[in-house]
């Protein structure tokens, strides 16, 4: 039984690398099943967001190199390139890492709540793929509990700091009066929902939500009094859009340089502010080369985020302590579980010996033997049988000079110093 947490994130890899290592929702089930089959991982889950791609694995004797090799091969990367950005946590450190991630302590935005939902989705997908068993399942449940306690017992989530908030904060710096601005939001997921909420609260003049399906776009638009369109309508909407914020799960760019260039001409080169939160990117990087376009990626949000984190630093210290306690408690309980099978086997063996001696005593009583003599023989016989195997093994270990095993046996049987009966025979 061992755990591995392996991956890359915004601190170790550029957005170029992250988008190449990202998994689409459609890939996850097949990727998990392939991972377990080819690497002999016993249990596995994958967390893939715009800021990180991580693999959580339970195994018996598996090196991180085989997992890295699988990940590099799956995404058609060189092993050296991936290894340069990857990190590996094992056992206790892996447990603590998972709990830190779920609590928002390892996020670009300290304490952001979205990561817990993403972690729960990773668990649900792994269950669907059939790659989560009892051990990784227990770890996920302990991780969710630790993250919930961090939210409940600290102030780490009190202030509205998130990637979505950072994107809107940048927009406020570009446009002094957002109430005169029009925004085009591409996507309809959790991040875009947060962006829409922030823009709506700031009184943005008009919000348009573009999505692959009109139904999902309409649901989000209705919540904030916005307009819903399809992705194919984006070129027409660009002409009136001062702010464009995109976050989809598309594997290919949705917005190219040509479409933006055409929109700028019709806008008479009135500036467009763009934030691409997606990984892989939704907006071609070449769009940033255009005059009158302010294009920011996820990595560009670091500075804005840093300015909004000061109020959370104190809470983070308390959260780290809670996570450490949670990780230690989980590993302690897991190690206790490792003894369950041994204890069960020992109990079954003891009960078999008991039943044998009891049957013998019952036969003696049926044959008219003295009850007191039968009880004495029952007690002696049971004691001898229970002690036989341990006695043989202890003598063998002693002959081999295994002082450590003898000391362990003394602790196992709760034999303190002076507990030996020294009554003369």
Curated annotation (Swiss-Prot):
Keyword NADP part of the UniProt annotation: yes
Organism superkingdom: Bacteria
UniProt signal peptide: none
CDD domains reported for this sequence: NAD_bind_Glutamyl_tRNA_reduct
Key words of the record: NADP, Oxidoreductase, Porphyrin biosynthesis
Record SUPFAM superfamilies: Glutamyl tRNA-reductase catalytic, N-terminal domain, Glutamyl tRNA-reductase dimerization domain, NAD(P)-binding Rossmann-fold domains
GO molecular function: glutamyl-tRNA reductase activity; NADP binding
Binding residues for NADP(+): 187-192
Leading EC class: oxidoreductase
Active-site residues, as the UniProt record annotates them: 50 (nucleophile)
NADP found in the keyword field: yes
EC number: 1.2.1.70
Pathway(s): Porphyrin-containing compound metabolism; protoporphyrin-IX biosynthesis; 5-aminolevulinate from L-glutamyl-tRNA(Glu): step 1/2
Positions bearing the site annotation: Important for activity: 97
Matching InterPro entries: 4pyrrol_synth_GluRdtase (IPR000343), 4pyrrol_synth_GluRdtase_dimer (IPR015896), 4pyrrol_synth_GluRdtase_N (IPR015895), GluRdtase_CS (IPR018214), GluRdtase_dimer_dom_sf (IPR036453), GluRdtase_N_sf (IPR036343), NAD(P)-bd_dom_sf (IPR036291), Shikm_DH/Glu-tRNA_Rdtase (IPR006151)
Family under the similarity heading: Belongs to the glutamyl-tRNA reductase family.
NCBIfam families named in the record: hemA
Subunit-structure text: Homodimer.
Job description of the protein: Catalyzes the NADPH-dependent reduction of glutamyl-tRNA(Glu) to glutamate 1-semialdehyde (GSA).
Other information: During catalysis, the active site Cys acts as a nucleophile attacking the alpha-carbonyl group of tRNA-bound glutamate with the formation of a thioester intermediate between enzyme and glutamate, and the concomitant release of tRNA(Glu). The thioester intermediate is finally reduced by direct hydride transfer from NADPH, to form the product GSA.
Domains as described in the record: Possesses an unusual extended V-shaped dimeric structure with each monomer consisting of three distinct domains arranged along a curved 'spinal' alpha-helix. The N-terminal catalytic domain specifically recognizes the glutamate moiety of the substrate. The second domain is the NADPH-binding domain, and the third C-terminal domain is responsible for dimerization.
Protein name: Glutamyl-tRNA reductase
This protein's encoding gene: hemA
